Amino acid sequence: MRHVLILLLLISVNGYSQSISVLDFVQVKEGHRAEAVFFYENNWKLYRDIAVKKGFILSYRLEEVVADSAGTFNLVLITEYRDSVFFQNSEANFREILATARPNGPLLLNHLQPADFRKNLFVKITRNLFRSYPPIYTTENPGHLE
């Protein structure tokens, strides 16, 4: 429901022509960095590589916090959608990807479930106002597939 309200807000402020980014802030539980990185590299990244190829998303990034004095989160997962329409369709698009890419569920390191190695703290959804692109950027190559 929260995503629907945010989507309506984005649409009402001319969200159709601007990209939408979803930022997930994740706290990795003590001593479980390896499991978290394995999970995101072998599942989250795979799903987004497929989504980029299908044109469902523009780009994605997984950022690790280098220094956080508050110590609240360790990872920021960023998924960029072309516009609010692609964002609105994201659940259906990713449901299709997950069903075909990992029909038996995600790959896990040490058989730990995600709740055992990470805590999703909060999500922020942003609308791009302006940006720069690297010289090699095209819609077919959004800069991270060099």
Identify the meaning behind each predicted range.
Residues H3-V13:
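Sec-dependent N-terminal signal peptides
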Residues G15-S17:
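Boundary at the C-terminal end of the N-terminal hydrophobic targeting segment
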Residues S19-L23, N74-V76:
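Intrinsic-disorder/low-complexity, polar/charged segments enriched in Ser/Thr/Lys/Arg/Asp/Glu/Gln
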Residues L23-L58:
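N-terminal targeting signals for Sec/Tat export/insertion, comprising classic cleavable signal peptides
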Residues K29, R33-V37, A70-G71, E80, ...:
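Solvent-exposed, acidic/flexible segments
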Residues L46-L58, I78-S132, H144-L145:
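An amphipathic, aromatic/His-enriched active-site/gating alpha helix that lines ligand/cofactor pockets
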Residues I57-I78:
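Acidic helix-start/capping segments at beta-turn-to-alpha-helix junctions
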Residues Y137-P142:
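Extended amphipathic alpha-helical interaction segments
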